[in-house]
């Protein structure tokens, strides 16, 4: 048994001295005698001293306490025993529902699947949200990012996606709450409970009030649980299709920045850690699909000061298959979900994957919206009357498209009082195709606001004229 003693404590950073011939490896977990605190080795400083990060509060720690090397990285329980439970970064239950039953424990630091084991798919994942299904469709087994500044609706959009996909998708889900509000974690738990899908969801939380070590590692804990479901073969010899929700990936980066500063590394651009790209890559490369099973990942990405060129969101962009960008200017118009249809993109946007009709409709919608965007300056200076008849028609259609992108959400029913709407992809394509074809030029634009499919628009317009 390899034991050392604490020699220095600076906030969440603890230095431990071991015999020089028996220094623990980087990422090994150390247990401190008489406490529940786990330390993770981050650096070997020489002379037998290792610098570690504490996964938990260091209150009450003092010099010369004995730390024991476990000989392996942090391990967490995996398997069906985690479903329906809320756990912390170490896999301990925090929902007061008794101990977790498990048959296996996995280390949270793992290698990504090898190149030949990976598999890609072109199968689409229908979300029931019009603007997403039309403009930036999701792939099954793909990676999706929800980008947005503070208060534009990332978490509400994620909750709606969970509501629409996790309920329709019979597989398993893992939710990792990384550095977010505890209230949101609580809301999510009750939302899942009320909709009877709690027994298919494992929840791992490392919230805002926790030390940086917890927030940095909790995403890996959630990912490890998802990997187990993907890789563990059932009686048919296949793994499972898993949904992995991470809210919020920016807090993962931020925790890394805090840890990096505490470890004494020289900061890089905007104060981020110099290892930002590597840390992001280590996490993202593991979120992938294999021939055995798939992980479909939906990640919320906070955009500091609405600046998409900030190193953190910019580093995340390269790893994603679909990006859903939420815009403050669209939220200011009262259009929710506040997705920017011109700034959101998807690798699935190919006629061979989504079909000619969907592709052509999306292109025409984008052209109409882009034309309106280009004309906005002229309208602001000269007014609508100075536009040509063709331009007036384009503006009218674009405003209808903008409003038709809005949609009442199931998870927002309690706030808005309007019942949520799920719109199948075929209905979405049919509706937008009809608008750009000019079939509804005679209807008022207010009729397109906060409805489901195009039939509801006609119904609303008839009520308005009645």
Swiss-Prot record:
Pfam families per UniProt: ATP-synt_ab, ATP-synt_ab_N, ATP-synt_VA_C
Membrane topology: Peripheral membrane protein
Localization annotation: Cell inner membrane
Gene Ontology molecular functions: ATP binding; ATP hydrolysis activity; proton-transporting ATP synthase activity, rotational mechanism
EC number per UniProt: 7.1.2.2
GO cellular component, one term: proton-transporting ATP synthase complex
Keywords attached to this entry: ATP synthesis, ATP-binding, Cell inner membrane, Cell membrane, CF(1), Hydrogen ion transport, Ion transport, Membrane, Nucleotide-binding, Translocase, Transport
CDD domains found in the cross-reference section: ATP-synt_F1_beta_C, ATP-synt_F1_beta_N, F1-ATPase_beta_CD
UniProt catalytic activity: ATP + H2O + 4 H(+)(in) = ADP + phosphate + 5 H(+)(out)
Major enzyme class: translocase
Binding residue positions for ATP: 148-155
Gene3D superfamilies: 2.40.10.170, Bovine Mitochondrial F1-atpase, Atp Synthase Beta Chain, Chain D, domain 3 (1.10.1140.10), P-loop containing nucleotide triphosphate hydrolases (3.40.50.300)
Functional description taken from the UniProt entry: Produces ATP from ADP in the presence of a proton gradient across the membrane. The catalytic sites are hosted primarily by the beta subunits.
Family classification: Belongs to the ATPase alpha/beta chains family.
Subunit record text: F-type ATPases have 2 components, CF(1) - the catalytic core - and CF(0) - the membrane proton channel. CF(1) has five subunits: alpha(3), beta(3), gamma(1), delta(1), epsilon(1). CF(0) has three main subunits: a(1), b(2) and c(9-12). The alpha and beta chains form an alternating ring which encloses part of the gamma chain. CF(1) is attached to CF(0) by a central stalk formed by the gamma and epsilon chains, while a peripheral stalk is formed by the delta and b chains.
Alphabetical list of NCBIfam families matching this protein: atpD (TIGR01039)
Name assigned to this protein: ATP synthase subunit beta
Species the sequence originates in: Xylella fastidiosa (strain 9a5c)
